[in-house]
A protein has these predicted regions:
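Membrane-interfacial entry segments at the cytosolic side of transmembrane helices
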Residues: 164-176, 208-217, 236-247, 262-266, ...
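Aromatic- and kink-enriched transmembrane "portal" helix at the membrane-lumen/periplasm boundary
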Residues: 22-30, 34, 55-70, 77-104, ...
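Transmembrane-embedded, aromatic-rich helix segments that form part
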Residues: 106, 146-159, 191-194, 264-271
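Specific aromatic-rich, kink-prone transmembrane helix
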Residues: 43-47, 90, 102-122, 129-137, ...
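Short hydrophobic/aromatic helix or loop-helix immediately within or flanking a transmembrane segment
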Residues: 1-23, 34-35, 42
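Short hydrophobic alpha-helices at membrane interfaces in multi-pass membrane enzymes
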Residues: 71-78, 113, 120-138, 167-180, ...
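Membrane-interface transmembrane helices that cradle and orient dolichyl/undecaprenyl
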Residues: 52, 57, 65-71, 110-129, ...
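Transmembrane-helix motifs of polytopic, lipid-linked glycan transferases
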Residues: 31-65, 109-113
C-alpha cells in the first residue's frame, strides 16, 4: 500500500529466497525483522558506550581504562541496550513482518555513524562518514520517514564537535538549521525528484510523442550526469565559476527548492540561491559544496529504489493499489493522498463548517395564491460549497479514444486533450485541478485532535462533547454596507413563510 517502502520489499524478498516452501516465507520475513532488531540493539550498545566513555574519560587521560571506568562504560551499554530491547514497543516491532524494525535499524545506524565521524572529525577523509549518513537516510526514506528525525541529533553532534564555544543560544540555532534540513529533504528533495521527472515526462510523451515513462528515464540520466559533472568539477578544483555553475545546476535539477504546490516558490528560492552564490558569497569552501553535492547525489541513489514501484505496477501484479505505473500517479501514491490529511499543528475542528458561496435564487412555493390565481412564490438564495483549486492533475490517455470533457477545464485545455487523443500513441490528458473545500476559519485552532465530522458519534464514546449554550461562541456576520453585526443565516435550513404577517423568516 502507499507509499510502497521498496527497500523493505527488496530486503524481505531476499530473505524469502531462503524459505524451503511458500508456507515458510512469512517466517523468513519475520526472521529478517528479528535480525535487524538485534543489530539495532548492538548499535545502541556501541552508541551508549561511546557516549558514556566521553562522560567518564578525560581527553588528556593516557593509558588503559581503569577497572571502574570499564565497568561503568560496559555496564551502561548493557543495561541501556537490554532495557530498550525488552521494552514492549521495540520487542513487538521486532517479531512482526513490518517496516519498523528496519526503520529502527536505520535510525541506530545513522546515529552510530555520526559518532564514528565525531571520533575522526579532524582527519582529512572524515567527510566520508557524513556522505554515508546521507546515503543511509536516502535508503531509509524507502523504508520509513521516521529516520529523518535523527537529523537534529546529528546536527547537534556535528556542531558540538566542530565548534568549541557552543552554548544554549547556538544550540537553538543548530536545531533550527536541522529543522530546515528536514524540511528541504521531506518537502524539497523527496517530492522534488518526482516534480522534475513529471516535467520531463510531459515534454517527452506529449511533446515528442515518446512512450510512457521515457521522460522519467531521461530525467534520471540527465540528473546523474549533472551530479557527476558537479562532483568532478569540485574534485578537480576547477574555476570558481564552473564549480558554482554546476553546483547551482545540480540543485536546480534535484527539484529540492520547489517546495509546496506553487512553482513561484521554487523560482524565487533559485533566484535567491543564484544571488547568494554568484554575488554575495564569493569564497564558499569547496569542501562544503562537495559534501552537499555528494549528499544530495547519494540520497538520489537511495531514493531511486522507488523505480521498483513503477516497474512492479507496470507488470500489473494482482496486488496493485492505485496502479502507480507513471510519475503522476506515483506522486499521488508517495504523497499518501488516499489517506487524506490530518491537521496536526493548526486546522479545523469538529465544528468547522465549510464555506459556501451564493450562486443565485430559486423560487419556493408558499402554498398561497396571487390575485390572478398563480402560485405565490418567494425567492430562496442558493449556495454551493466553496472549493479551492490546486495544481493540474494528469492521467494516462486511452489510445484512439476521445477524452471525456472534464469539469473545470478551460476550452483550450479540452481542445489540447482532444488533439493528443487524435494524434494516437501514448499521451497524458489534463483531468482537472485538484480541489479542496474551504473551511470557515472561526473555529480552527492549534493542535486540533477532534476534527473529523464523519466520526462525531465515535468521539462521543471517548470524550464529553459539551454543546450547551454556555460553552458555545456566538458568531455574527458583518453587513458590508452598514458595518453592523447581523446574525448569520443557516444556509442549510429552509426559510418559512408566515401568511398572517406576509414575512419570510430565515433560520439563524
Amino acid at each position: 500500500h502507499p507509499p510502497g517502502n521498496p527497500i523493505f520489499m527488496l530486503t524481505a524478498r531476499f530473505f524469502a529466497n531462503f524459505a524451503p516452501d511458500a508456507a515458510k516465507i512469512s517466517v523468513m520475513v519475520n526472521a529478517m525483522s528479528g535480525l535487524l532488531s538485534a543489530l539495532t540493539i548492538l548499535l545502541l550498545f556501541w552508541t551508549i558506550t561511546h557516549l558514556v566513555r566521553r562522560l567518564t574519560v578525560k581527553n588528556d587521560q593516557k593509558g588503559e581504562l581503569s577497572l571502574t571506568q570499564y565497568l561503568v562504560i560496559m555496564g551502561s551499554g548493557v543495561v541501556g541496550a537490554l532495557a530498550y530491547c525488552w521494552s514492549d514497543t521495540f520487542w513487538f516491532s521486532a517479531v512482526e513482518g513490518e517496516v519498523y524494525a528496519f526503520s529502527s535499524f536505520c535510525t541506530a545506524l545513522v546515529f552510530w555513524l555520526i559518532l564514528k565521524w565525531e571520533n575522526r572529525a579532524d582527519e582529512p577523509q572524515s567527510d566520508r562518514y557524513l556522505i554515508l549518513i546521507a546515503y543511509v537516510i536516502g535508503v531509509s526514506i524507502a523504508v520509513h520517514l521516521l529516520n529523518l528525525l535523527c537529523i537534529p541529533a546529528i546536527v547537534l553532534v556535528f556542531a558540538y564537535r566542530k565548534y568549541k564555544d557552543m552554548n544554549l543560544k547556538k544550540s537553538i540555532y543548530a536545531l533550527l538549521i536541522s529543522f530546515v534540513i528536514i524540511a528541504l529533504v521531506l518537502f524539497g528533495l523527496v517530492p522534488g525528484f518526482i516534480k522534475m521527472a513529471q516535467q520531463f515526462e510531459l515534454l517527452f510523451v506529449n511533446g515528442f510523442g515518446c512512450s510512457f515513462n521515457t521522460g522519467a528515464v531521461v530525467y534520471a540520466f540527465v540528473a546523474a550526469a549533472i551530479f557527476i559533472w558537479a562532483i568532478v568539477a569540485l574534485r578537480n578544483d576547477s574555476s570558481p565559476l564552473l564549480m558554482k555553475g554546476t553546483f547551482f545546476l545540480a540543485i536546480f535539477v534535484s527539484g529540492m527548492l520547489f517546495i509546496g504546490s506553487s512553482q513561484w516558490v521554487g523560482w524565487v528560492l533559485l533566484a535567491a540561491l543564484a544571488g547568494w552564490l554568484f554575488y554575495i558569497k564569493n569564497n564558499i569552501p569547496v569542501r562544503v559544496m562537495s559534501v552537499i553535492m555528494w549528499s544530495i547525489a547519494v540520497i538520489f541513489v537511495g531514493y531511486s529504489s522507488y523505480a521498483l514501484i513503477l516497474i512492479r505496477s507496470s507488470a500489473d501484479t494482482p496486488m496493485n493499489q492505485n496502479s502507480p505505473d507513471n510519475v503522476f500517479d506515483l506522486a499521488s501514491y508517495l504523497n499518501r493522498e488516499q489517506y487524506g490529511e490530518t491537521p496536526l499543528l493548526y486546522g479545523e475542528t469538529l465544528y468547522s463548517g465549510v464555506q459556501r458561496e451564493y450562486v443565485g435564487d430559486s423560487q419556493m412555493d408558499t402554498g398561497e395564491k396571487n390575485d390572478d390565481g398563480t402560485p405565490f412564490t418567494i425567492p430562496v438564495p442558493n449556495y454551493r460549497q466553496k472549493m479551492e483549486k490546486g495544481n493540474m492533475e494528469y492521467a494516462k490517455g486511452v489510445a484512439g479514444a476521445a477524452p471525456a470533457e472534464s469539469a473545470g477545464l478551460k476550452p483550450s485545455e479540452i481542445r489540447n486533450n482532444e488533439k493528443l487523443a487524435s494524434r494516437g500513441g501514448d499521451y497524458y490528458v489534463k483531468k482537472g485541478r485538484k480541489e479542496e473545500p474551504v473551511l470557515n476559519p472561526e473555529l480552527n485552532m492549534f493542535f486540533p485532535r477532534i476534527h473529523s465530522r464523519m466520526h462525531r458519534d465515535a468521539y462521543r464514546t471517548w470524550v464529553s462533547l459539551d454543546t450547551t449554550a454556555d460553552n458555545l461562541r456566538e458568531l455574527h456576520a458583518v453587513d458590508v454596507n452598514s458595518g453592523k453585526k447581523v446574525p448569520e443565516y443557516d444556509v442549510y435550513g429552509q426559510p418559512t413563510y408566515n401568511p398572517m404577517t406576509g414575512t419570510v423568516v430565515f433560520p439563524q
